Amino acid sequence: MNDRARARKLADRIKVVVAETLERRVKDPRLGFVTITDARVTPDLREATVFYTVLGDDTALAETAAALESAKGVLRAEVGRQTQVRFTPTLTFVPDTVPRQARQIEELLARARAADREVAERAKSAQPAGEPDPYRFDGAAAADDDEPAT
């Protein structure tokens, strides 16, 4: 089996095991509303990075990070028990910044849409600076120019 495929499967299993263990066994009051979003394992299967998000402010994020650090041993033992790999990967917990960045991008897009609507409203009542159609060909003036000189 390909090492990358095995690492991907192990990462998926670690994600599930960590999420279930946090829900059922870890009873730390500092642990807020945490969601395990992703897990990645190195090709040698020795280290796993677990990404998480927390509902709340930066204080809740810091408290959850401390709770995850203190529960790291229990989580690693459970991962080893349920995955039955020769070497249980070392767990590293990293806050996932994707939801925060997505929210910022959505806010920027909303501002851009509002600015576009404002420009469209202004364009409806705008008047040209010069003639309404500067390239319009006036037929009467052209008829005088087309007559041959006698």
Curated annotation (Swiss-Prot):
Residues 119-150 are annotated as: Disordered. One of several proteins that assist in the late maturation steps of the functional core of the 30S ribosomal subunit. Associates with free 30S ribosomal subunits (but not with 30S subunits that are part of 70S ribosomes or polysomes). Required for efficient processing of 16S rRNA. May interact with the 5'-terminal helix region of 16S rRNA. PROSITE patterns: RBFA (PS01319). GO terms for cellular component: cytosol. InterPro entries: KH_dom-like_a/b, RbfA, RbfA_dom_sf, Ribosome-bd_factorA_CS. GO terms for molecular function: ribosomal small subunit binding. It holds the Pfam family RBFA. The keyword Cytoplasm applies. It is found in: Cytoplasm. Keywords: Cytoplasm, Ribosome biogenesis. Monomer. Binds 30S ribosomal subunits, but not 50S ribosomal subunits or 70S ribosomes. One of its GO terms (biological process) is maturation of SSU-rRNA. The lineage of its organism: Bacteria, Bacillati, Actinomycetota, Actinomycetes, Acidothermales. Belongs to the RbfA family. This is Ribosome-binding factor A.
